[in-house]
Amino acid sequence: MRDNKARWRTLSIPAALALVVLVAACSGRAPEGGSADTTVAGTVHVCSSCHRPEGRSISPTFPRLAGQQKDYLVAQLQAFRDKTRADPHAQTYMWGMAARLSDPTIDGIAAYYAAQTPVAGQPIASPETAAGKKIFTEGIPSENVPACMSCHGEGAEGNGPIPRLAGQHQAYLTRQLEAFASMARANEIMHENSKDLTPEQIAEVTAYLATL
């Protein structure tokens, strides 16, 4: 009995939250007498503990979801659930949270966040953001780095399975580019696009995106 209590005491916050989800809301089956909408609402409420209400995260650990592309959100939630997205933060925070999400619940969660108003970045004029804008709009031809806007859109709004980057936390974007470059987050296209970026160039383009 003492060992069980000790295990509960040593659960990390993400693991504890994951247990709450697994027990309470994320099976994707509506409670008796309830509805699928109720299940989605309950799950979104749990999501808000990290991503904040309406997906307007204030912590760079957790991405802003408000206004994100629905198709992208669906793909990522399915990847978390199926453990095919395996970067360290995905494993720590999202594998447990998404473990029992059904496809209909995932669709409802994605639709909810996609319908929210995106967080606007804070425009900052600096040499760093100017350099980042150039990478975003023109790429780095000498290093075979394409313009980010060619896929993500002129305003970094994304399209379908291609994510919105505008107004996202700089630290989060930096972490993702580093994960793509190292293949900790598997994506062949993004690996090719990011593997030759220097830390300074990553800092520049992510600083610019955070201002949009």
Model-assigned labels for residue ranges:
Residues 14-24:
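Bacterial N-terminal signal peptides
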Residues 58-64, 80-117, 122, 159-164, ...:
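Axial heme c-ligation environment in periplasmic c-type cytochrome domains
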